[in-house]
Amino acid sequence: SIRGLAQYTDEVRERFLNLAISYNINIITGSMPYVKEDGSLYNVGFLCRRDGTYDMYEKVHVTPDEVKSWGLSGGKMVRTFDTDCAKIGVLICYDVEFPELSRIMADQGMQILFVPFLTDTQNGYSRVRVCAQARAIENECFVVIAGSVGNLPRVHNMDIQYAQSGVFTPCDFAFPTDGKRAEATPNTEMILVSDVDLDLLNELHTYGSVRNLRDRRNDLYELKIKKPLQD
């Protein structure tokens, strides 16, 4: 069961942390089950830094099927993370379909948003992809989506998977006209490598042909969070 898999989460995290140290890289893991002290089951992932430190992020919005099949609870953690490369945010799969979360992160200075995801159909994938591209435009940031491919026969909710990982950008003169920095081959296991220039974001914030962050009408509307930003 998914709850049984949670007993391996600490071990998996330590393995990724060791890889981050060994290869001198920062790793944003895929998500995995995690049981908190009160017994509630969550979908979480980890930022494993090359200096040996790590942070955990939680999936805030769980799908109806995740509740029905696995009994997952939604997390309460909405925050950005500092790395030696950039200030980043992480939204797990379905979370990217809620623009409020990424806007809160953008207000905290997020430069790159990472979206690990698992979708079983092209419909589900399209929701994640289209929303991810919208988040890049709205928040004037880079967005990286990384999804699972392959099949696990007879494993409920994991038997079929469809993905095309990619790196998306805002749509303005300094960026690709279609907002696509790099894309993997659809539904194919591969490594996608891409460089991004954070200085372009600073220029966009000030000199962009449109300025989605600066031009908000705060005199008409506002975004507020009711819970603490961290649990």
Regions found by a protein language model. Name each.
Residues 8-28, 97-189:
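CN hydrolase (nitrilase-like) catalytic-core segments centered on the catalytic cysteine
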Residues 57, 81, 146, 184, ...:
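Hydrophobic residues at beta-strand termini and immediately following loops
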Residues 31-32:
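Recurrent small/Gly-Pro-centered beta-turn motifs in extracellular repeat architectures
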Residues 1-9, 38-40:
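Metal-dependent catalytic neighborhoods of phosphoester/phosphodiester hydrolases
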Residues 14, 18, 36-111, 121-134:
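Active-site catalytic loop in hydrolytic enzyme cores
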Residues 181-203:
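A hydrophobic, small-residue-rich beta->alpha segment in the mid-to-C-terminal subdomain
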Residues 83-108, 201-231:
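Cysteine/selenocysteine-centered motifs that mediate thiol-based redox chemistry or coordinate metal-sulfur cofactors
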Residues 46-48, 166-168, 192:
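Conserved hydrophobic/aromatic positions in well-ordered beta-strands
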